[in-house]
Swiss-Prot record:
SUPFAM superfamilies: FMN-dependent nitroreductase-like. This is 4-nitrobenzoate reductase. PANTHER family: NAD(P)H NITROREDUCTASE YDGI-RELATED (PTHR43673), NITROREDUCTASE (PTHR43673:SF2). Induction: In the absence of 4-nitrobenzoate, expression is repressed by the transcriptional regulator PnbX. Transcription is induced by 4-nitrobenzoate. It comes from Nocardioides sp. (strain LMS-CY). Optimum temperature is 35 degrees Celsius.
Length: 247
């Protein structure tokens, strides 16, 4: 096997500035939970979602359907979910998308707890005893953290596993497309916990499964919660390399 490649093969597909720009977009994407009171142009939202539809999809079935909410429509969803939250008082999940608080195994349990401590403890200065304040910030999930735009992403119910894989690629493309335009986002599984309220408010048909909500807007970098930051494991912790000896 030749150790050299033709120039047209070895040359990067993207010019270096484009590579640097893409890397900056990926590294700059964060789950933002504080938003400025600044509207996002409709054209920008449409552009983000139009680009997201270029995400890979098994057999090109494109199983996603997204609801875009602003103004009174977003407020109506927030009111509906919080009313359900206050009345039912417990989560009602459509499917078991993740374990309960005590069902996580290591190392995921430790990572999850570290995230919670960073968010509530270091960023907001709250202890486990600050029940009311922690509850206040948890409820902000259902107002999309005051973002001007809220998205609810759904996929076809069948075949659900395939559709959920497609949804992951679609959602990530939304997040990166938004970031490239100076917008911030937060993908939120919390809306799944009260899916009956979401489904009823938006008249989501039964053949669709709710995947997540997404907050979309411009970050309020002055809010204390904006200081929260997460880390990632080094590549050798999550990748097994099986290099060929000739590579």
């Amino acid at each position: 096997m030749s150790s050299t490649a033709p120039e047209d093969v070895a040359r990067p597909l993207l010019a270096l500035p484009a590579i640097e720009a893409f890397d900056a977009i990926v590294r700059g994407r964060r789950s933002v939970r504080s938003y400025a009171d600044v509207q996002v142009p409709r054209r920008t939202v449409r552009d983000v979602l139009e680009l997201a539809a270029r995400a890979p999809s098994n057999s090109n079935v494109q199983p996603w359907h997204t609801y875009v909410l602003t103004g009174r429509h977003k407020r109506a969803l927030t009111d509906s979910v919080l009313r359900y939250y206050d009345t039912i008082g417990r989560t009602v999940r459509e499917f078991d998308y993740q374990p309960g608080p005590d069902g996580w195994e290591e190392p995921y349990k430790e990572r999850r707890e570290s995230f919670g401590e960073g968010l509530y403890g270091r960023a907001l200065g709250l202890s486990l005893a600050d029940v009311d304040d922690r509850e206040f910030y948890h409820r902000r999930n259902y107002d999309f953290f005051a973002a001007p735009v809220g998205l609810i992403v759904t996929v076809a119910r069948n075949p659900r596993l395939s559709a959920l894989i497609d949804a992951g690629a679609y959602i990530q493309t939304i997040l990166l497309s938004a970031r490239s335009r100076g917008l911030s986002t937060c993908a939120q599984a919390s809306f799944l916990d009260f899916h009956p309220a979401v489904r009823e408010c938006l008249a989501i048909p039964t053949h669709r499964t709710i995947v997540c909500g997404i907050s979309l807007g411009y970050e309020d970098a002055q809010h204390p919660i904006a200081s929260n930051a997460t880390t990632r494991e080094p590549v050798d912790r999550h990748v097994t390399f099986l290099w060929d000896d000739d590579d």
